[in-house]
Amino acid sequence: MTTPRSFGPLGDVALLRGHAPYTLAGYAGFRAVIDTDGAVPARLKALFIAVAAIDRRYPELARRELARGASLGLTVRDATAGLIVLSSLRGEGAALEFADVIATVFDDSGAPPPQDLPHAGPGEAEANFLAYFGTIPVPLAQLMRLCPGAADAYYLMRRGSIDANPLSPKHGELLLLAILAAGYSPMAATHVRGARMAGATDQEIAEAVLCAVPAAGIAAWIGVGAMLAPD
């Protein structure tokens, strides 16, 4: 029996081929959405899958998907968007793991010269929070009260993830959503709103969330899907 490419490595598991036709058919259906151009380009969806895989600590899945993205035209600069978002959202360990994956996939992953580091001016963090959230969320209000320097640091990192991302702000938001969906995080609601503010359609949001399925299963959709229900 020929194994359709859309199964991915799951199709190589003899026990699944012999006992789980519904599972493989369903997975192939998800792959048909996330492996091809749709509302979101396939090369970016491969990046989203790779970064979600790092979130779930599956570096081999991440390497395979990043290589697939590169074959579709994904660049090192594009991949750096994942490195930036992981640094902010999941910390040093996840970011370094993804940096290793980037180095194995791209023959030339040379970086440009270092840039000067920005600083947050007085009131800059608060203004950014108000512009994005509409109000100061309680956790950030307490961070500003108890450790203002850390509040500035939070602002700089979230600005790097969205406004200064090598991708567009819209695709930066969608990348964040893929990670949050993979982690079944309630924070996804904030970035559904942020993605819409950045111009994303619900179809784009849906495809980004589905990019979490290879690493986190169909439960990744359940946590976010209800947020897309029409008002």
Please state what every model-predicted region is:
Residues V51, G82-L86, V101, L177-A178, ...:
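Short acidic/histidine-centered micro-motifs embedded in hydrophobic/aromatic stretches
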Residues P114-P118, A206, L210-A216:
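Alpha-helical transmembrane segments and their immediate juxtamembrane flanks
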